[in-house]
Amino acid sequence: SRGCDRVPVPRPALRRSGAGSVGSEVVSHQPQGRLRPTLWAISDLHTGHTGNKPVAEELHPSTPDDWLIVAGDVAERTDEIRWALDLLRKRFAKVIWVPGNHELWTTGKDPVQVFGRSRYDYLVNMCDEMGVVTPEHPFPVWTEEGGPATIVPMFLLYDYTFLPAGAGTKSEGLAVAKENGVVATDEYLLSSEPYATKDAWCHDRLVHTRKRLDDLDWMMPTVLVNHFPMVREPCDVMFYPEFSLWCGTTATKDWHTRYNAVCSVYGHLHIPRTTWYDGVRFEEVSVGYPREWRRRKPYRWLRQVLPDPQYAPGYLNDFGGHFVITPEMRAQSEQF
């Protein structure tokens, strides 16, 4: 099998953002004159991979009052996760973290051998010590330009309901994926204990999170933050569509409208792009692996969430991506 923990390059022809083709310049979203506090986001730093730790070291705020969302997959080892979040917390006025699947892996090289929910609890306590906001903390409110907005960090996992074509159930979906050589590394390294399955853990998190969301002031705008996409559509551009099984849950398909979101921030897919669903902006903010970002050369590491970046015409590529689509990438996409 491909051991498909991650997808490679998107198929750009599948979806257009309406933004036109991209130019070669990096466009600043800050106005001329005094810089304003900004809510930034990034995900999938994967600092354990050679070449990615310098990326984390390059991240700096534009003002002393900037906040940073870190939307999961910082690293696999607990010491690497601590190093990165501590570095960022010392630079940004507030850091908001949600776990990805990689933080929940327990590998033989990890100095902390805890599994499943106990591992998540360990990471939450670690963040608490550093002053990093997690899904278990009170939701912070952004009151600078673009606000007020409640920032809602979530840990939801997935329940195998993003089914590939030809599958009607989880078991059928896993069989289709296996036939095509696609098996997520999560199946070997991500423990769900004490839950019987990952989908059971997901369903428990959904109930917990919905209750907190239902208690919010429905008039207050929100920024929904989850490692996995809240809707299925972003998965449509993956080279290996079967990987969608490990990418989210259909239970959240209307949360961006139900809970008054002005933006939904996610990562996981390693396809940094901006799209709109039901008029709501979705920002995939991942860095990805060195072999990916070195090839496509993203415009910038940090993504502006608030104030609304108001992307200039031509800034996004022809499917909403934050990188130039090279002829080689187009040629590869035509093979799928």
What residue ranges belong to the model's regions?
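Short coil/turn segments at beta-strand junctions that form active-site/ligand-binding loops
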Residues: 66, 93, 147-148, 219-221
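Binuclear metal-dependent phosphoesterase catalytic core
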Residues: 36, 130, 236, 242-260, ...
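Active-site neighborhood of phospho(di)ester-bond hydrolases with catalytic His/Asp-centered motifs
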Residues: 41-43, 68-73, 96-101, 133-138, ...
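N-terminal active-site segment of His-dependent metallophosphoesterases
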Residues: 24-97, 103-109, 195
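Rieske [2Fe-2S] iron-sulfur-binding domain
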Residues: 1-23
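Active-site-proximal loop/helix segment associated with metal-binding centers of metalloenzymes
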Residues: 150-223, 230-239, 334
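Metal-dependent catalytic neighborhoods of phosphoester/phosphodiester hydrolases
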Residues: 51-55, 74-89, 102-129, 143-146, ...
